[in-house]
């Protein structure tokens, strides 16, 4: 229904804002700090509840209701663990950065510091850590799809590290996620680039009077393009912007 679509759209927008804010913080400070993580979660969840202060949080099997894992309950303990994680994230060591990312992700999800949004916050931390280590220039590697597709393995392996110290299988899972997501991302970027060229050619040939590279960029930056976007970027009147959009619609764009 419309309400659920609206809520999903808000979640996506919040995720985008949180990721870009994190990217800005890491780019400016060359650090990924506890206070940055708290700010990212606040943007994701649109509240300032912050780190868990009340006991009672458990991770349960969705089908049976069985408690699978009980994260740290004490506020001071959570703070201390996050401080330790902050040190590990930012201090150099001899471990490969991708393996470090797997370790950091497991530790963060095990601390489970927030009432809500731990999974999404953890996945943003993954991206920001790779940027911090110069493995990414911009935040374009989204592991969420792989993790959600392989959710059962994700939770099983998280727990097996806690109960059986099975780090190797967990690390291999994360490395596979990075590899598969990287290949899919390259394919997606190439597809977008090809489509952009096709749209550019179509507009320049069929609507040469309104064509500009800025116009094409607007269409790809904003899948739902509004009059205001054209007015601001192209410095044209609302009437002209409306005319442009109608002409684009008439040629099937």
Segments from the language model and where they lie:
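FIC/Doc superfamily catalytic core
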Residues: 1-253
């Amino acid at each position: 229904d419309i309400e659920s679509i609206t809520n999903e759209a808000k979640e996506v927008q919040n995720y985008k804002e949180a990721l870009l804010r994190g990217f800005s913080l890491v780019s400016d400070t060359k650090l990924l700090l506890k206070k940055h993580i708290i700010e990212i979660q606040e943007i994701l969840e649109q509240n300032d509840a912050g780190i868990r202060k009340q006991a009672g949080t458990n991770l349960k099997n969705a089908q049976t209701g069985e408690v699978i894992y009980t994260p740290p309950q004490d506020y001071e303990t959570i703070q201390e663990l996050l401080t330790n994680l902050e040190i590990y994230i930012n201090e150099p060591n001899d471990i490969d950065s991708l393996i470090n990312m797997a370790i950091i992700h497991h530790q963060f999800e095990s601390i489970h510091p927030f009432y809500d949004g731990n999974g999404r916050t953890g996945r943003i931390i993954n991206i920001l850590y790779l940027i911090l280590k110069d493995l990414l220039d911009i935040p374009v590697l989204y592991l969420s799809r792989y993790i959600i597709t392989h959710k059962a393995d994700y939770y099983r392996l998280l727990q097996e590290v806690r109960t059986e110290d099975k780090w190797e299988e967990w690390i291999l899972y994360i490395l596979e996620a990075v590899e598969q997501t990287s290949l899919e991302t390259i394919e997606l970027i190439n597809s977008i680039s090809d489509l952009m060229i096709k749209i550019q050619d179509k507009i320049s040939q069929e609507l040469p009077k309104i064509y500009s590279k800025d116009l094409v960029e607007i269409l790809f930056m904003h899948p739902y393009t509004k009059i205001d976007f054209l007015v601001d970027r192209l410095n044209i009147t609302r009437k002209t912007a409306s005319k442009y959009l109608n002409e684009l619609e008439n040629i099937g764009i």
